Amino acid sequence: MHNEPTCHPNRRNIIASAAGFLAAALVSEIKAEGGVDYFPAIDTHTHFYDPTRPQGIPWPGKGDSVLYRKVMPDEFQKLTAPYNVQSTIIVEASAWVEDNQWLLDLAKGDKFIAGIVGRLDPADKEFSAHWKRFAKNPLYVGIRVNHSDLQKGLEDKSYLENIRMIASDQRQLDVNGGPATPVEVAKLAKLIPDLRIVINHEANLVIDGKDVPKDWLEAMQLAASNKNVFCKVSALAEGTRKTMGDAPKDLEFYKPVLDSLWNVFGEDRLIFGSNWPVSVRAATYATIHRIVHTYFSSKGKIAAEKYFMKNAIAAYKPPTRG
């Protein structure tokens, strides 16, 4: 049996927790080699798993020479300490229901973990029971769904009722999918305006250094017209579709995408995330962080502080960990 809190946090407690988290996390900026000041950050997109456990893992597969190994928070914490990463929000990639609990157990004794974005299927008849079980834990900040499932779910009353359960518990929804994803996100945002929604990975746009596609931009504008929609600037290097650690390192290559996101979402609804360890296929953490640090620093200290931490707290409302 797992020991879990027995009550759902209410709105007042969640707001207080978010405020407390920010107060606890905002520490002095770190000055790294070269005299660069790094803003306190929450990396809102990481994956952890252990293929050596008895039951194994459903993802990544054994044939993945890069990712198929034990990947745990202590490694990530050491890697990112020079960049002032204060904590992380883990996104569950496994489709196994019990892996939601595995991550909550992992987080229980590790204050570096700010929250868990779980994986449950709102189309599942058992969703309500699973949700109530995991959401008792305040570290369970929401779930992630795929665009294709959301597209079908928008026509399903029971699916939408389950999504409303997430909103009523003051949790959030990550949505992952291709460039058409923001269209369905916009529809959902209008249907459930009190649900905080986070688009993952810039809607997985192919990043080629050129002007962004009109369809993607218009879809993002449609989603961003709803104030409850955020966009995670994550998997940026993977967007280049490079897989040998050879993604471009020059900020200018990514500027058309970053400028478009900035113009569409502004300083209050863009969120920092790396997609580590998947990101190592395309680039080092140092490269990924430098690109976004350089870009958002150019927007001023207030905007950079929002991007690296404050917007994550607004979207995910992680509990204070004393």
Task: Report residues per predicted region.
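Mid-to-C-terminal alpha-helical segments outside catalytic/metal-binding sites
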Residues: H2-L26, G34-T44, L67-S87, D259-S260, ...
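Mid-domain alpha/beta scaffold segments of enzyme catalytic cores
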Residues: G34-M165, D169, V175, P179, ...
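Active-site metal-binding loops of divalent metal-dependent hydrolases
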Residues: T46, A93, E202, N275-W276
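Short aromatic-enriched loop/helix-cap "lid" or pocket-rim segments at secondary-structure transitions
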Residues: T52-I57, A129-H130, K210-V212, T243-G245, ...
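Short, small-residue-enriched loops and turns at beta-alpha junctions
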Residues: A95-W96, A123-D124, D149-G153, L205-D208, ...
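Catalytic pocket-lining loop regions of alpha/beta-barrel enzymes
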Residues: E155-I271
